[in-house]
Amino acid sequence: MVTFFKFNKNRINLLCGDLNVSPNEDDVWSHKQLQNVVSHTKIEREKLIKIMNKGKFIDTTRMFISPPENVFTWWSYRSKDFKKNNRGRRLDHIWVTNHQSLESLNAKIMIETRSLPQPSDHVPISYEFNLG
């Protein structure tokens, strides 16, 4: 992956998906309680941030939703009322390189899909941009 982005560094690159890591304290419901839990351990967070920095990626969601506001894309099925408990994590990401050549319009987390019948434990995220 690093090699691909190294050889394509002058292009606009998107990396998106379920990366299964919540890199920032604001990406989990309780940093203190989850710092030793898979998806938010120190080593996972450091490695993901290293990949982001090495690839010169920008976190599109955080372009529009700034810390300290929590951003979650995943809630456990164990919670009967995910909205009330709101014990989520942000495991899904959309990153972009060379964003200065894009007109960034919007990023959205579609939380309402988690309330559908038989939902996924993840909710979709979107990033809207104009290539010019």
Predicted regions and their residues:
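Short helix-loop capping/hinge motifs at secondary-structure junctions, enriched
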Residues: 100-103
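Short acidic, gly/pro-rich beta-turn/loop elements at beta-sheet edges
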Residues: 27, 105, 117
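Surface polyanion/phosphate-binding segment centered on an Asp-His-Pro turn
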Residues: 108-132
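Generic structural signal for residues positioned in beta-strands
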Residues: 59, 94, 106, 124-126
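Metal-dependent phosphoesterases centered on the DNase I-like endonuclease/exonuclease/phosphatase
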Residues: 1-96
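Short linear functional motifs in flexible/disordered or boundary regions
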Residues: 72, 106-107
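Hydrophobic side chains in beta-strands
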Residues: 62, 96-97, 109, 129
